[in-house]
């Protein structure tokens, strides 16, 4: 019988000790992936010895590199409450890419409270119980009870927070100042970790048509969030595009376990997309974290190198965005000025199924017009500098 591509399965677990495989559970640690590419490549050294003829001997085999890539749909955890620590499988990938998992398991305050005095369309002044430390709520979801009639439209996000005045700058511009209640809802957040601590590694199992690979010291070497807009003409799921490197700890013949069906993925539509204080149209937004992994040389290891470590990340945002008139949205002036602007995407209709991407500050590169289709669009990058919580991903549980 032939091995079949569809009989592919993947499981992952946070690894506690370098070079020691932690076996993932074949029930609770199974992650649905797609578009897998997997490579085992030889590391060779040319043999330059003379042979007394025009012919040369083959290369010496020095070792191997193991790498791959896959996509995983950006499916929220769902359920009625925030998952337990480290239970959300996509979160393990994010932690290995230098994100911190932050669980807000109780809303703040537990019951919605009255706003303070002085709110305007871009700021919500929180009530007396709100935190007094700057940026406590930066990058997090917030519910403002009077900004919309539907529950999911009452959810927005905090760009910056000033503790002394309890003023939360918002990621969108409201039609009128909020004047009723506020609450920081329960949420599972992944906030970019700016500490010097090394990103953790993963232990993974990969089944390819009845053959299992145990991969140790699995390091996320590339990460992109690809969020296409679903329209009346075409639809596509938001996803994480993941690259990895690893070492083979073991391999054996083993039937691929079943990967559970997890239901539909929320699509990016009927939501919010704000850039620089304007609700904009477009067909996609992609965040590339520009990860780079290196391997310290060490002859005590089988391959002559220690496990890979993240050594660099350079984050950019690329959009295919609707083009506007100068008076509406002047990207040329914004690029020339090099000020910081917020980028905010939100979608999903239900509590536990809502997704937010919050980039509080990013700078425009020059944007190029694209005239090749029915509508003129602009394409170009925005640069994300090194700030605390410079990119946040929230899964929101709201009442």
Predicted segments, located by residue:
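Signature of extracytoplasmic/envelope-associated structural regions
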Residues: 1-399
